[in-house]
């Protein structure tokens, strides 16, 4: 990622990445041209922002359920522009949409790049004109995110402030971190709650959980045992059981959770100290809920909290639909026998990692999914009452095509979950290196000396008599034996660095991500693709980069371009797929309008 491109084509591609972000203002311009008036939720957001612009701070539309962060951001941006340019004096829909598009095209990519470089522990050495990576461009082109970047919705800014808080939280973990970084993180964590209430689960649970895991990794060794009792006992010795995702079975997730709890109890003071900033943010949110009487702001009767576990089933086909280009190569390496795997796709994974879900996993997870579908399929009245949303058509197929369709869909949920979680651990990381060989400190027994060795000794003695001083100097330069204890300490240091550098490939990260995702989704009765933007972005940020195929790992200069194409093919395929989806959904929105019989003359439009 940081290497300088070796070909003109690679250099051109690198500089072309930022220009891809111009699609965002182009999309917004098209929306303004065809839909100049507020559409759908904009009918609530835009008048509220205009009220704030008129300094009517106490006016609030009860149909709005999210906090006022979006309107405050637009007020600050437009006030600054007014100060510099003398306009705009009135905030019309295009002006407000422009503040959202600017955040999506300028601020969000820059902060995403910082987060990506930090997560992957890489320095950004790209030249200024090519500062953004292909991965960041693809995240910004993610269809639900891209679509709402041209409208006046809360999604872009809700994501932006979470990413910015994450950057500061990651900077707190550096050895030279200062109290200022913690203070800034606290401010950003609270600000994140002003844009969307469910951000609390990302700035407190997700960030806090990862911080605890990082803290525990610094003070622990690997637990070599796989026995549950031994794993729990090993916690008192600061040994953590946390395997790589591709080496883990379903039982390993339970063992890792138990090991984390055991080690955390053994380091309780350190864990509590590391959680203080997140607990402060959580307490602030709790104070808001007590003051407001509810989590939502406006019409509470339409947005009451409920236990909607089925949300954690819908997420998997959603991820697979958008990210299948990134899953093709991993799935080929895992599923296909080695003799059937094309050489340009073979990334050298051992046979132990080329396996399907175990029968035990199937027998445990599938019945749970079936039970969730049977007892917890919640259909919000808005879902089947509004045919402008794509979710309307998905649920109509699930519920109305056949009584057993929703149960058969559990196979899709299961396979999707397996693919998405497996991709999280799809990394070339192997087991920790073995101990270095110890230099002998004793000579071999005399009986073991061969005739050749005796002849060699005689020759050395003659050379010694001829040039004693020179031989003495050579002998004095021989390396001294290394203490085995030093070698053991060195190996443990390597293992610890490996755990820290590849934390996203381990079971502990998946557990924390799943917990934050579940908490942010299962309390919402309404199924909205927009609600899954932050879970997807966090998954995408932490997705390990694709390893180089074995055939190209020692490629000659003539094959260098071919190797780069092979490595980056999933990224290019992802770009093409996102552009195709954006063109289709954008065209449907702009050109595929229709009318409702109950509202003649008013154009209805398809959207996420």
From Swiss-Prot:
Superkingdom to which the source organism belongs: Eukaryota
Region listing for Disordered, in residue ranges: 446-466
Record GO cellular component, one term: endoplasmic reticulum membrane
Catalytic activity annotation: an alpha-D-Glc-(1->3)-alpha-D-Glc-(1->3)-alpha-D-Man-(1->2)-alpha-D-Man-(1->2)-alpha-D-Man-(1->3)-[alpha-D-Man-(1->2)-alpha-D-Man-(1->3)-[alpha-D-Man-(1->2)-alpha-D-Man-(1->6)]-alpha-D-Man-(1->6)]-beta-D-Man-(1->4)-beta-D-GlcNAc-(1->4)-alpha-D-GlcNAc-diphospho-di-trans,poly-cis-dolichol + a di-trans,poly-cis-dolichyl beta-D-glucosyl phosphate = a alpha-D-Glc-(1->2)-alpha-D-Glc-(1->3)-alpha-D-Glc-(1->3)-alpha-D-Man-(1->2)-alpha-D-Man-(1->2)-alpha-D-Man-(1->3)-[alpha-D-Man-(1->2)-alpha-D-Man-(1->3)-[alpha-D-Man-(1->2)-alpha-D-Man-(1->6)]-alpha-D-Man-(1->6)]-beta-D-Man-(1->4)-beta-D-GlcNAc-(1->4)-alpha-D-GlcNAc-diphospho-di-trans,poly-cis-dolichol + a di-trans,poly-cis-dolichyl phosphate + H(+)
Keywords tagged on the record: Endoplasmic reticulum, Glycoprotein, Glycosyltransferase, Membrane, Transferase, Transmembrane, Transmembrane helix
Membrane topology: Multi-pass membrane protein
Listed Pfam families: DIE2_ALG10
Keyword Endoplasmic reticulum part of the UniProt annotation: yes
GO terms for MF: dolichyl pyrophosphate Glc2Man9GlcNAc2 alpha-1,2-glucosyltransferase activity
Protein location: Endoplasmic reticulum membrane
GO biological process: dolichol-linked oligosaccharide biosynthetic process; protein N-linked glycosylation
EC number, UniProt record: 2.4.1.256
Broad class of where this protein is predominantly found: endoplasmic reticulum
Family: Belongs to the ALG10 glucosyltransferase family.
Record's function text: Dol-P-Glc:Glc(2)Man(9)GlcNAc(2)-PP-Dol alpha-1,2-glucosyltransferase that operates in the biosynthetic pathway of dolichol-linked oligosaccharides, the glycan precursors employed in protein asparagine (N)-glycosylation. The assembly of dolichol-linked oligosaccharides begins on the cytosolic side of the endoplasmic reticulum membrane and finishes in its lumen. The sequential addition of sugars to dolichol pyrophosphate produces dolichol-linked oligosaccharides containing fourteen sugars, including two GlcNAcs, nine mannoses and three glucoses.
The protein, known as: Dol-P-Glc:Glc(2)Man(9)GlcNAc(2)-PP-Dol alpha-1,2-glucosyltransferase
Organism: Emericella nidulans (strain FGSC A4 / ATCC 38163 / CBS 112.46 / NRRL 194 / M139) (Aspergillus nidulans)
Source taxonomy: Eukaryota, Fungi, Dikarya, Ascomycota, Pezizomycotina
Gene: alg10
